[in-house]
Amino acid sequence: MGNCLKSPTSDDISLLHESQSDRASFGEGTEPDQEPPPPYQEQVPVPIYHPTPSQTRLATQLTEEEQIRIAQRIGLIQHLPKGVYDPGRDGSEKKIRECVICMMDFVYGDPIRFLPCMHIYHLDCIDDWLMRSFTCPSCMEPVDAALLSSYETN
């Protein structure tokens, strides 16, 4: 909070005169010598992976075996069906649904992913979850076992 009381030295006119004299000492509105800002350099972010839930490492620090395991997970995740959230046209589904990972309500048109146990989540939320743990966050059913068994029955 500032001081509300006027003092004889802090009136608007004296402040105006001080700022004009300051500008004159720098050469009429020019700034003192400054270097130009450095050129913009875009840094490409290095992906961060979680080989196990308790470990976080940059992609460049992973062993070949860990890179293969992550590539396999990404391949399995891409085989899970995805869609767009549509609460239903007839209004029969009146309860509010939310993604249990981010705790945000689903909005019409949100990209979602379906797990074999029929739970749905925001696409980005569940993909990130499955990179850490390949189980459903709601029922803890292993996603890879259900996914692999669906290929065996066909």
Swiss-Prot record:
Keyword field: Cytoplasm, Endosome, Lipoprotein, Metal-binding, Myristate, Nucleus, Palmitate, Phosphoprotein, Ubl conjugation, Ubl conjugation pathway, Zinc, Zinc-finger
Role description: Essential component of a ubiquitin-editing protein complex, comprising also TNFAIP3, ITCH and TAX1BP1, that ensures the transient nature of inflammatory signaling pathways. Promotes the association of TNFAIP3 to RIPK1 after TNF stimulation. TNFAIP3 deubiquitinates 'Lys-63' polyubiquitin chains on RIPK1 and catalyzes the formation of 'Lys-48'-polyubiquitin chains. This leads to RIPK1 proteasomal degradation and consequently termination of the TNF- or LPS-mediated activation of NF-kappa-B.
Outcome (variant: Y40A): Abolishes interaction with NEDD4
Start and end residues of each stretch annotated as Disordered: 1-52
Modified how: Ubiquitinated in the presence of ITCH, SMURF2 and UBE2D1, as well as WWP1. Phosphorylation by PKB/AKT1 may accelerate degradation by the proteasome.
GO biological process: one example: ubiquitin-dependent protein catabolic process
Provenance organism: Mus musculus (Mouse)
Compartments (UniProt record): Early endosome; Recycling endosome; Cytoplasm; Nucleus
Residue positions of motif PPxY motif: 37-40
Gene name as annotated: Rnf11
Native organism taxonomy: Eukaryota, Metazoa, Chordata, Craniata, Vertebrata
Free-text note on domains in this protein's UniProt record: The PPxY motif mediates interaction with NEDD4.
SMART domains: RING
GO cellular component entries: early endosome; nucleus; recycling endosome; ubiquitin ligase complex
GO molecular function per UniProt: ubiquitin protein ligase activity; zinc ion binding
Name of the protein described by the UniProt record: RING finger protein 11
Description of how the protein assembles with itself and partners: Interacts (when phosphorylated) with 14-3-3. Interacts with the E3 ubiquitin-ligases NEDD4, ITCH, SMURF2 and WWP1. Also interacts with the E2 ubiquitin-conjugating enzymes UBE2D1 and UBE2N, but neither with CDC34, nor with UBE2L3. Interacts with ZNF350, EPS15 and STAMBP. After TNF stimulation, interacts with TAX1BP1, TNFAIP3 and RIPK1; these interactions are transient and they are lost after 1 hour of stimulation with TNF. Interacts with GGA1.
Residue intervals of every RING-type zinc finger in the record: 99-140
Modified residues (Phosphothreonine): T135
UniProt-listed Gene3D superfamilies: Zinc/RING finger domain, C3HC4 (zinc finger)
